[in-house]
Amino acid sequence: MRLKSKIREKKQKPKPTSTDLKIMEWRYNQFLGEKMTYKEIKKDPTNQTFLVTDIKFALDSSHIIVGDKGGRIIIFKNTQYKGENNLEYYFEYLAQDKDFDVHKSIEYTEEIKALDIFPNYNYSNIDILSASYRTIKLDRVYEDKTNIFEDMNKNNLSIPKLNSVKSEIKVKNKKTLTCEKFYEINSLNLNKFVTNNFLSSDDFRVYLWDINSKNSAVYNPIDIEVESNSLFNLEKITKSKYSNFNPHIFFYGTNKGVIKLCDLRSNSEQIKLETNFKDEKSNIKNSIGNQLSSVHDICTSFSNQNFVASRHYFNINLWDIRKQNEPVSKYLIFEPAINKLTYLYHNNYLNDKFSIDCDSSGKYILTGGYNNMFHVFDIEQRLNTQIVIDEKNDQLMNTNIIRKINSKGSCYYKKDDDDLNLINFDQKITKHAFCPNSNFLVIVVYNCIYTYHGNLGKKVG
């Protein structure tokens, strides 16, 4: 007589179908700043100094820093309120000053071109990197505590008693870095693994720096000035960033639409460019085509080592570093505006630069657009969530316009052509930040910031 086995086969869990998947819904949460309209900014030039030029989360998401055209840096604390992120004003200071080049007789403004913040391992200190046109500064914001005692030995000898502790937030400059060969600085990025190292880039060079080094840049691995010194090959570096998955790898993009992966381990003295990412199917080669293909920004994921995303004027390209000849996916940003290309060119709107951010998993990508609209792309479900920021209409600010993206990367409807003339190209979102460890967005509109929380809502289908 055979005994029946008591071991039962494990039932495999069914794979989630499209109807089981849920959509991330983004809800407006907080507003910070003093509202200004585009007309007020255009009318009074002094208002332009308050325009935000860069924004960055700390790696541990404890703080967020904001830089503006006036050289100021504003620090916000990221606190928890009812289980959600909430920003609180902490401190602000003047980080950059005007600079004058004696040899070229050129005055450079104090505008913050790029910034970054060190992880806050010492909770009493906040170390911040900021760059103007030609100067990089390392500042430390700290809390200075002073003990205040009662009047000692006023009448008779006694042990002094502590009355109170006076706390004051101060800032001091720890280091100022300059380089004679500097062109206009366009990038500043910390190494996520070796936090005393960072990189910067200008039009023709990428510099690697060490905070602890007494000298200037450790070395200059990328120099394309000689290659670009031609009337027919005016290639310039537009953005550079360390990867979020390897301390030895960084990327830089150019105005020709090329993204290059650089591995610091390939050569101890001179970098070897191992990978070129360029969309070979792009057949636009005129000056307007270069502006459209120019790399505005680059982002990488902490978890997916093969994932690289780049923002261009009309689209986002998703790259797999194992496939170099073309992007694996392309997402179009407001496709109908291509029909107004001549208008955009003659009004200099093609010079607008848009940022790109992604969450730690690389599942969601955040970018801005015109008409005060920002987009959150769901990579897995191929969805484009569009939200318009309108301070006069709270209901509109909480309205998630969700569109399915087709195989060509488009979520275009014919009715969009009717709305094209209603788009205000002066109202644009170019700067934003994605919290490193939660579904929390910070969106910049002129001199104000708006925050959004993401929660899984209704199912797809």
What are these model-predicted stretches?
Residues 68-69, 78, 133, 203, ...:
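Short loop/turn segments immediately following the C-termini of beta-strands
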Residues 73-78, 136-142, 150, 206-212, ...:
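WD40-repeat beta-propellers
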Residues 6-47, 81-111, 138-187, 207-241, ...:
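Inter-blade linker and blade-boundary elements of WD-repeat/beta-propeller domains
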Residues 55-61, 116-125, 188-195, 234, ...:
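Loop/turn segments within WD40 beta-propeller blades
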Residues 41-73, 111-114, 119, 186-188:
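Beta-strand-rich domains and repeat architectures in extracellular enzymes and scaffolds
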Residues 64-67, 127-132, 197-201, 250-253, ...:
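Conserved beta-strand element within WD40/beta-propeller blades
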Residues 301-318, 322, 345-400:
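Loop/turn-rich, solvent-exposed surfaces of beta-rich toroidal or solenoidal domains
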Residues 430-461:
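Blade-level signature of beta-propeller repeat domains, shared across WD40, Kelch, NHL, RCC1
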